[in-house]
């Protein structure tokens, strides 16, 4: 078996990736989220496949087909709620994974990091299109509002929006193409994940100290397979509690009303995992400015390697930057809360302050803190 594992053309790829992979001996549970994201992706693809067997992407029957899945299909309610809440678990793991990358300076592995940003955009696009498919009120109006943002692009904006809609409003053509894209994107994401792993295994994993760990590597299996499995148990426990006891807690009640183009909901808002970006979008009174801020709120991750001023890689031994980091985390919670609130005083001013703080901490305060720490430790 050992010979086959190391010699067989296919199995040896798996062997070098998950079995004999040299791994730092000191990586913590924050390194579990990569494998958990893989699990989330598998859950989403499998539940999505079974949902697609019963779903119809037609404006007249989409809402009814989802109701039919929940009422008449064997365990359809479970598959539907696993898929809906699986998206939430996916984003929780994603945010923690990215947060770990920022804290421990993993962005210095530039190819892996940039691939991760592309993956983040792809997952966000997939989740957005998936939210449109049940064709409830928030599905319809969310699709209308978010796609309409593209009209802010000078000269070609309006034409581009109508091209995406396939008409003069969000309608049957839009729903059909969103279903097609929502189906294909997870497979593209799977391919991108393999590239992400390929880049990661070129350099090897980072570790909490940020120091070179070549002198102290251990095989991935059994040490980290068992550690990942513990993470899987925790994730599945939380996931099934959420799905079986509180399936609708993260959803919007408006989405249980069929889409009606003649009736606008009082507060149009996306799913919780987009609220931080939505708050940044709304905090700028200008449409084009808001769209640019929205894109930059994620794209800013790409310039993190350029903003790294410290002589140390991680924040483990850097208390000043640590403080900035946790203020940034708190700021993201505030933005998430504001994104779900109506556009009125005092929420608007809180949102604007939090948006300015978000960009200021990343672009100005954290690099300055890095330089101060270099001086304190006399690393210059």
From Swiss-Prot:
Cofactor(s) listed in the protein's UniProt record: heme b
UniProtKB keywords: Electron transport, Heme, Iron, Membrane, Metal-binding, Mitochondrion, Mitochondrion inner membrane, Respiratory chain, Transmembrane, Transmembrane helix, Transport, Ubiquinone
Keyword Disulfide bond listed: no
Residues annotated for a ubiquinone binding in this entry: 201
A GO cellular component annotation in the UniProt record: respiratory chain complex III
Transmembrane segments: 33-53, 77-98, 113-133, 178-198, 226-246, 288-308, 320-340, 347-367
Gene Ontology biological process terms, A to Z: mitochondrial electron transport, ubiquinol to cytochrome c
Positions contributing to heme b b562 binding: 83, 182
Subcellular location: Mitochondrion inner membrane
Residues reported in the UniProt entry to bind heme b b566: 97, 196
Membrane topology, record value: Multi-pass membrane protein
Cofactor notes: Binds 2 heme b groups non-covalently.
Gene Ontology molecular function: metal ion binding; ubiquinol-cytochrome-c reductase activity
Biological role: Component of the ubiquinol-cytochrome c reductase complex (complex III or cytochrome b-c1 complex) that is part of the mitochondrial respiratory chain. The b-c1 complex mediates electron transfer from ubiquinol to cytochrome c. Contributes to the generation of a proton gradient across the mitochondrial membrane that is then used for ATP synthesis.
Misc remark: Heme 1 (or BL or b562) is low-potential and absorbs at about 562 nm, and heme 2 (or BH or b566) is high-potential and absorbs at about 566 nm.
Subunit structure of this chain's protein: The cytochrome bc1 complex contains 11 subunits: 3 respiratory subunits (MT-CYB, CYC1 and UQCRFS1), 2 core proteins (UQCRC1 and UQCRC2) and 6 low-molecular weight proteins (UQCRH/QCR6, UQCRB/QCR7, UQCRQ/QCR8, UQCR10/QCR9, UQCR11/QCR10 and a cleavage product of UQCRFS1). This cytochrome bc1 complex then forms a dimer.
Family: Belongs to the cytochrome b family.
Name listed for the protein in its UniProt record: Cytochrome b
Gene: MT-CYB
């Amino acid at each position: 078996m050992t010979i086959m594992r190391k010699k067989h053309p296919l199995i040896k790829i798996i062997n070098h990736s998950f079995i004999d992979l040299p791994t730092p001996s000191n990586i913590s549970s924050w390194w579990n989220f990569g494998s958990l994201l893989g699990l989330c992706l598998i859950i989403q693809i499998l539940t999505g496949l079974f949902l697609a067997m019963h779903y119809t992407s037609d404006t007249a029957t989409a809402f009814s087909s989802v109701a039919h899945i929940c009422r008449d299909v064997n365990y359809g309610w479970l598959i539907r709620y696993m898929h809906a809440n699986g998206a939430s678990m996916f984003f929780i793991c994603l945010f923690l994974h990215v947060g770990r990358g920022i804290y421990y300076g993993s962005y210095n592995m530039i190819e892996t990091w940039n691939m991760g940003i592309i993956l983040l955009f792809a997952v966000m696009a997939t989740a957005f299109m998936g939210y449109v498919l049940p064709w409830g009120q928030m599905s319809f109006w969310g699709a209308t509002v978010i796609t309409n943002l593209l009209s802010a692009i000078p000269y070609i904006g309006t034409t581009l929006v109508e091209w995406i809609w396939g008409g003069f409003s969000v309608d049957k053509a839009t729903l059909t193409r969103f279903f097609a894209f929502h189906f294909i994107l997870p497979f593209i994401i799977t391919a991108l994940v393999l590239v992400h792993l390929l880049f990661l295994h070129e350099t090897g994993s980072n570790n909490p100290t940020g120091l070179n760990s070549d002198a102290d590597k251990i095989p991935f299996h059994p040490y980290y397979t068992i550690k990942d499995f513990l993470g899987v148990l925790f994730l599945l426990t939380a996931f099934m509690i959420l799905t079986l006891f509180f399936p609708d807690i993260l959803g919007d009640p408006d989405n249980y009303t069929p889409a009606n183009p003649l009736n606008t909901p009082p507060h149009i808002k996306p799913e919780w995992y987009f609220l931080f970006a939505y708050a940044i979008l709304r905090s700028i009174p200008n449409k084009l400015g808001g769209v640019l801020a929205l894109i930059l709120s994620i794209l800013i991750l790409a310039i993190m390697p350029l903003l790294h001023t410290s002589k140390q890689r991680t924040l483990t031994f850097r208390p000043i930057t640590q403080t900035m980091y946790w203020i940034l985390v708190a700021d993201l919670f505030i933005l998430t809360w504001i994104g779900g609130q109506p556009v009125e005083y005092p929420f608007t001013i809180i949102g604007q302050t939090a948006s300015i703080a978000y960009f200021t901490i990343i672009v100005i305060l954290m690099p300055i803190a890095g330089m101060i720490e270099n001086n304190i430790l006399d690393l210059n």
